[in-house]
Each structure stands twice: as structure tokens, then as C-alpha cells.
């Protein structure tokens, strides 16, 4: 597989965690948290990130219920993924995000904002599947 840069998003209505990684190192790391409830501000920042990093594809965490089924947040994540594809023409992969926030809190060892770390965990899961 050729080397690819990937961005990942842990979508929330008030915050979006962002992580970056690539297929050469198969390593993901937290990048930033987008704090905004306004759609235009969120997508403006996402556009800037896409222009700066030029990912070949993006990964979006899919908020499934504990039993693996859909819940209201699942639809919001799918809608966000569709918006990314529609607005920016980027390939989008969905990855089960169950437990990523708890794992992020464990890694951080605090109650600090964990959205970017959760995005890194989601992206790492995707990269591990590719390996």
C-alpha cells in the first residue's frame, strides 16, 4: 500500500476531536480540538486542516450503541461523514468509536478534554486494521 496521510474526526455537536496519522508509520496522534457549535466555523477549520495536511482519506468515528446498533448519535456521525465527502470530495471511512473516550481518559489520566485523543484512538484502530 502506498503511503497515505489520514485525518480522523471524533464528531460532537459542540467539539470535534482531530487526529493525524499515516500508513507508513501506522501511528496516529492527537492534533487538535475544534470548539464550535456553528457549522460554518467548524467546516472552515476543517477546510483549513484538509488544505494544510492534504489527507488521501479521512476517518470518522461512528457512535454506535453498546450492542453495536444505531442510536441518535450514529445518524449525526453518518451525516457529518457525508458532509465531509460532499463538501470536500474526500474519501471517508467510518470506524466504530465505542470505548474511545474512556480509553482516551485512561491515557490522559485526567479529566482534560479528550476529544483529540479519542480521534487518535479511532484512527489507530483503523490503521491497525490495515496492517
Swiss-Prot record:
GO terms for cellular component: cytosol. Its main location: cytoplasm. It holds the Pfam family RuvX. One of its GO terms (biological process) is rRNA 5'-end processing. It comes from the Bacteria. Signal peptide: none annotated. It is found in: Cytoplasm. GO terms for molecular function: nuclease activity. InterPro entries: RNaseH-like_sf (IPR012337), YqgF (IPR005227), YqgF/RNaseH-like_dom (IPR006641), YqgF/RNaseH-like_dom_sf (IPR037027). CDD domains: YqgF. Its EC number is 3.1.-.-. Keywords: Cytoplasm, Hydrolase, Nuclease, Ribosome biogenesis. PANTHER family: POLYNUCLEOTIDYL TRANSFERASE, RIBONUCLEASE H-LIKE SUPERFAMILY PROTEIN (PTHR33317:SF4). Could be a nuclease involved in processing of the 5'-end of pre-16S rRNA. Belongs to the YqgF nuclease family. This is Putative pre-16S rRNA nuclease. The lineage of its organism: Bacteria, Pseudomonadati, Pseudomonadota, Betaproteobacteria, Burkholderiales.
Amino acid at each position: 500500500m502506498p503511503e497515505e496521510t489520514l485525518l480522523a474526526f471524533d464528531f460532537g455537536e459542540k467539539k470535534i476531536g482531530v487526529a493525524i496519522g499515516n500508513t507508513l508509520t501506522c501511528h496516529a496522534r492527537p492534533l487538535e480540538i475544534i470548539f464550535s457549535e456553528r457549522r460554518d466555523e467548524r467546516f472552515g477549520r476543517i477546510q483549513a486542516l484538509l488544505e494544510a495536511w492534504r489527507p488521501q482519506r479521512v476517518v470518522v468515528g461512528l457512535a454506535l450503541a453498546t450492542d453495536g446498533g444505531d442510536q441518535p448519535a450514529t445518524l449525526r456521525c453518518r451525516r457529518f461523514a457525508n458532509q465531509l465527502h460532499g463538501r470536500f470530495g474526500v474519501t471517508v471511512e467510518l470506524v466504530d468509536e465505542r470505548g474511545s473516550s474512556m480509553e482516551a481518559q485512561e491515557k490522559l489520566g485526567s479529566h482534560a478534554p479528550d476529544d483529540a485523543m479519542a480521534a487518535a484512538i479511532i484512527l489507530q484502530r483503523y490503521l491497525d486494521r490495515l496492517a
